[in-house]
Design a protein with these regions (language model features):
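A generic structural signal for short coil/turn motifs at secondary-structure boundaries
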Residues: 5-10, 137
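Conserved N-terminal phosphate-binding loop of PLP-dependent enzymes in the Aspartate aminotransferase
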Residues: 13-14
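Charged (often Lys/Glu-rich) extended helix/loop segments that serve as interaction or gating elements
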Residues: 30-179
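Glycine-rich beta-strand-to-loop/alpha-helix junction loops that act as flexible
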Residues: 1-6, 37-39
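Alpha-helix-loop-beta-strand connector modules within alpha/beta enzyme cores
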Residues: 18-30
Length: 179
């Protein structure tokens, strides 16, 4: 539910237009209407930055294996959602190829994007766009992977909002059974 956001060519309604349409239909019923805005508030405000670990060529497909995984951004796997993926620094010294952008957790569902035309090399940073809504709240520690840091960017200033988890964070609260 809630208002959607633009991932590709979608045209979700503007909040004002959406509210007006609902009010016009339901105003005479005397109802209290509560609306969950969904991704409209934060969806396009967040980007997941990931590094290309290596490029893998199979007979029928190319893979860009990155250091982020489905546990960091579940929407592509869970909803077959499209997230625009672009190089942080475009380059002209790499050939353009079509890649599936996949994570390192060795699951068939561990992908962030399929069939993406990218000119990339190992070590490049990729921006997975529109990752602001529910990215962290849907993330997990699957395969004992610490969750990513969250950084707020305000103009030229950055602020650490949430530190990257450590393995110690993952073990916190666990107890060893008595001998």
């Amino acid at each position: 539910g809630g208002l959607g956001i633009r991932y590709q060519a979608e045209e979700p309604p503007l909040p004002h237009d959406y509210a007006t349409a609902i009010r016009d239909k339901l105003a005479d019923r005397g109802l209290e209407i509560l609306i969950e805005p969904g991704r409209a508030i934060a969806g396009n405000a967040g980007i997941l930055v990931t590094r290309v670990e290596y490029l893998k060529q199979q007979p029928e497909k190319r893979f860009a294996v990155v250091d982020a995984a489905m546990n960091d951004l579940l929407r592509p796997t869970l909803y077959n959602a499209w997230q625009n993926i672009v190089p942080v620094q475009p380059r002209d010294d790499a050939d353009m190829h079509r890649y599936d952008v996949v994570g390192p957790v060795c699951e068939s569902g561990d992908w962030l994007g399929r069939d993406r035309d990218l000119a990339i090399l190992p070590g490049d940073l990729l921006a997975v766009r529109s990752a602001g809504a529910y990215g962290f709240t849907m993330s997990s520690n699957y395969n004992s992977r610490p969750r990513v840091a969250e950084i707020m960017v305000d103009g030229d200033t950055t602020h650490l909002v949430r530190a990257r988890e450590t393995l110690t964070d993952l073990w916190r609260g666990e107890q060893v059974l008595p001998a």
